[in-house]
Amino acid sequence: MAAVFMVMLGRGKTFLPSALIGKPVPTFSLPALSGKAGLSDADLKTGKPTIVNFFASWCPDCHVEHPYLVQLSKDPGLAAKGVRLVGVAQKDKDENTRRMLGAGGDPYAAVGMDANGRVSIDFGVYGIPETFLIGGDGVILAKHVGAMSPTVFAQKFAPLIAKATGGS
């Protein structure tokens, strides 16, 4: 048992497996960031994969990953497959979130405001940023803890998106 713990500990914070992988997203409905669409579990059951990024304006690693998320949101290959990127602002204020997205670009098709962190808890989020890949049927396919990067996306998310959309 101690050996298993040490192996898991050595994998770092980005490896904590989620008990929700392979299960439907929790039921939720979040109010919208002003000027955007709100977000609910129904929005994640569109028949196409959705990338859900939990972030906050006060999170340093969220600012680190932000330029890559903006780049990802403009990827013509993902757009052709109908993949959307949506955000959940965790325990943040509307004006701070708008300021962050205004300064760095807005990669999100929709942003839900999780003011009390309840939806984040329901998703098993324990530290932001965290990013989930949701299948078109609303089933959680993958989770990444920490800043999203081209390497992580290519290794962890891209193959699952290809499989979910029947392409390469």
Q: Model segments located where?
A:
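N-terminal targeting signals for export/organelle localization
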Residues: 1-31, 168
